[in-house]
A protein has these predicted regions:
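Alpha-helical membrane-embedding segments
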Residues: 45-58, 80-87, 110-118, 153-157
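Membrane-embedded alpha-helical bundles that form the substrate/pore pathway
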Residues: 23, 27, 57-60, 64, ...
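Hydrophobic, glycine/alanine-rich multi-pass transmembrane helices and their short helix-loop junctions
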Residues: 2-8, 101-149
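Membrane-spanning helices that line or support transport/gating and their immediate boundary helices
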Residues: 17, 32, 64-71, 75, ...
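Internal alpha-helical transmembrane segments of multi-pass membrane proteins, especially GPCRs
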Residues: 18, 92, 96, 100, ...
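Helix-loop junctions and hydrophobic alpha-helical segments within the transmembrane domains
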Residues: 79-99
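Membrane-interfacial segments
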Residues: 5, 9-10, 38-42, 46, ...
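Hydrophobic transmembrane alpha-helices and their membrane-interface caps
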Residues: 14-73
Length: 157
């Protein structure tokens, strides 16, 4: 509901919120699948650190999606005559550098902690790493195309 409120100036704010939630659920599904596979292969268990990692991944994913959607909102006002697909593509191209730089910086730190940190947090770091990979992917390649497809379908109807 926060995204609907934050994007209330754009047409159909519910679509922004629903697209962000779908992308976040994709990331949560990926890390639950990861922990299920590692549980079968290596005996990893769901514990408090896993839940902390899951919430952190959800936050990172949602924040990254909000940044892209905010740029779409800004460009909607800046380029009112541009068709929606072109505007969204422009917005993604303007934010992809920021998204990748932020996620790569976090991943470099996670790799360093994974290599040099203690064994007690390795599961946490591995889940965070997979979740950040998934979050970067889903905010750019799940949430945004879903939003565009929803808008195109509404225009066609």
């Amino acid at each position: 509901f926060y995204i609907m409120f934050a994007f209330r100036q754009v047409p159909h704010p519910f679509r922004y919120g629903a697209s962000a939630v779908v992308a976040m659920m994709h990331d949560i599904t990926i890390i639950f699948g990861f922990i299920a596979i590692t549980g079968l292969l290596f005996g990893w268990e769901v514990d408090a650190l896993f839940l902390t990692a899951a919430l952190t991944v959800a936050g990172f994913s949602l924040q990254d999606t909000i940044v892209v959607f905010d740029r779409i909102r800004e460009n909607t006002r800046r380029y009112p005559l541009e068709d929606y697909e072109t505007l969204v593509n422009r917005s993604v191209l303007e934010t992809v550098h920021r998204s990748l730089a932020t996620q790569l910086n976090a991943m470099f730190v996670l790799v360093a902690i994974l290599l040099f940190g203690g064994a007690s947090i390795r599961h946490f770091i591995a889940v965070l790493f997979i979740g950040l990979l998934s979050g970067t992917y889903s905010s750019l390649f799940n949430a945004v195309p879903l939003l565009v497809a929803w808008e195109k379908r509404a225009e066609a109807a």
